[in-house]
Amino acid sequence: VDYEALEQSKKELQAIGNLGGAQRKRFGDPLTKREKQDYKKFFSVVNKHVVFYSESSGFYKYFQGIIEYLLENTNIVIHYITSDPEDKIFELATSNDRIRPYYIGEKRLITLMMKMDADVVVMTMPDLENYHIKRSYIRKDIEYIYIPHGMDSLNLTMRTGSMDHYDSVFCVGKHQKEEIEKTEVAYQLPKKKLVEWGYSLLDEMRVDYAKMSHQNSEVKKILIA
């Protein structure tokens, strides 16, 4: 355990005590009770292989392709942390007992991440370690994987250093891989594992389009963009 880092984290927690927007009542609030139960339940599980973290329900779509593949091709249990109490993952979990969802608000998430114990943590949130969300102080061999939101340039859309503390990045294509490699050379950063895995959202759009009925129009249309 990195005790110096833990001591520093106490100061950081005090400095960001108002994080998370509107304040909730701590006593008698059903979300507070639910959060405490899920926090305790998460740490009661040993040997967690894969943990996903989602900021809200809308981010599930970036993980969907990976999660569905793991469920279909492995026996891995998916531990899914979300800061959205209405996240669709809770409904999905009712039909698949290998999905274990947990509601953890933004404040309690800080300490949960500091105490994280898992083989792999998958996130779509940049700036790991740069701000309030840290790598685990308990376990140093966790592999942190970053999943991009889109297919565009990471250099043009991300802050400098926003991926420096991830171990792996699932790149949507060759252009993202080359950008990261050149950034690592320019700033003398440790090399990450860069996986060219594509973009599952585009795959799903193509499948949906193939299912649609198509009829060619005799009148040509011009799209100006």
Residue ranges and their predicted role:
Residues Y3-L6, E86-D87, N96, L202, ...:
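Short, structured coil/loop segments at alpha-helix boundaries
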Residues V1-V51, E68, E72:
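Non-catalytic N-terminal targeting/anchoring module and adjacent flexible stem/linker
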Residues V51-R206:
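Active-site and donor-binding regions of nucleotide-sugar-utilizing enzymes
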Residues K11, N18, V185, A210-H214:
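Generic surface-pattern signal
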Residues V1-A5, E12, L70, K174, ...:
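Generic low-polarity alpha-helical segments
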Residues D38-K48, V207-A225:
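Nucleotide-sugar donor-binding and catalytic loop/hinge architecture
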